[in-house]
């Protein structure tokens, strides 16, 4: 008898709507590939009962907290259910932008200069040292919650008097935030499925940066795959991404986002261990360039589940 597969979608994070779209696409793709797949929304169903409900494997199409931060992965480990994507530690590290940056920096990999702040520090008032460190980053800045995805709570700051509002917004979503130097070059993303590094994608948003609207709502965001890099640049990008992937301990499938600054240097932005799978999503786009249909992609990801 074929395995009964749970496709986890929706959930309770700020990225619920994106996850519902991802999950619906994954469900259709798995069924097209002959898989006995069923939708399960953790907002409505107790996922601790998945094994009792007869499921043998889990395809995680959840984004954000409770889906790709290691908590769900830990529960599935305890249940003894194989699942797609990275394990507990790699999922938790990848969801946490600050810890990812610290780990990559420790491994000698390039990351943008940053300052981290906690909610307690913000509410007490920034010290002169903290103000000086933020000032040294220059303008523009990018302010982001450490543990949110899909650019939720993120702001580009171009004037000093806008910083306070950007910090307040980011702290609505997390107790720890990052203030980063703005990198002005193009953004790239590189997907990994199993041992295969897929062709890179260059992202060109219509607005000032690749925010939530550009990712999921706008039809004006442009994607280039192949990315138009020289062969040596593409090789350097893929090598950097693989090092970043391995440093975090990621497995299965996912995506690493990278910026090419005006100095010609690639800088790591963040890792995504449960990337979007909507009509606007990037992993399916890279897979198509590599000759893989959407159905073949999701079946392959499921095969990698352990």
UniProtKB/Swiss-Prot annotation:
Enzyme Commission no: 6.3.2.4
**Which cofactors does this protein require?**
Mg(2+); Mn(2+)
Quaternary structure (record): Monomer.
State the InterPro entries in the record: ATP-grasp (IPR011761), ATP_grasp_subdomain_1 (IPR013815), D-Ala_lig_Van_CS (IPR000291), D_ala_D_ala (IPR005905), Dala_Dala_lig_C (IPR011095), Dala_Dala_lig_N (IPR011127), PreATP-grasp_dom_sf (IPR016185)
Role description: Cell wall formation.
User: What pathway does this protein act in?
Assistant: Cell wall biogenesis; peptidoglycan biosynthesis
**A molecular function GO annotation:** ATP binding
Stated family: Belongs to the D-alanine--D-alanine ligase family.
Amino acids binding Mg(2+) 2: 270, 272
Swiss-Prot/TrEMBL GO biological process terms? cell wall organization; peptidoglycan biosynthetic process; regulation of cell shape
- Which protein, by its recorded name, is this? D-alanine--D-alanine ligase B
Q: Which UniProt keywords apply?
A: ATP-binding, Cell shape, Cell wall biogenesis/degradation, Cytoplasm, Ligase, Magnesium, Manganese, Metal-binding, Nucleotide-binding, Peptidoglycan synthesis
User: What's the encoding gene here?
Assistant: ddlB
Show the catalytic activity. Answer: 2 D-alanine + ATP = D-alanyl-D-alanine + ADP + phosphate + H(+)
Q: Which GO terms describe its cellular component?
A: cytosol
Q: How is the cofactor bound?
A: Binds 2 magnesium or manganese ions per subunit.
Binding-site list for Mg(2+) 1:
257, 270
Entry-linked Pfam families: Dala_Dala_lig_C, Dala_Dala_lig_N
Q: Where is the ATP-grasp domain?
A: 101-303
* Location within or outside the cell: Cytoplasm
The answer to whether the entry has keyword Metal-binding is: yes
KW Ligase (keyword) present: yes
Amino-acid positions noted as binding ATP in the UniProt annotation, renumbered to this chain: 134-189
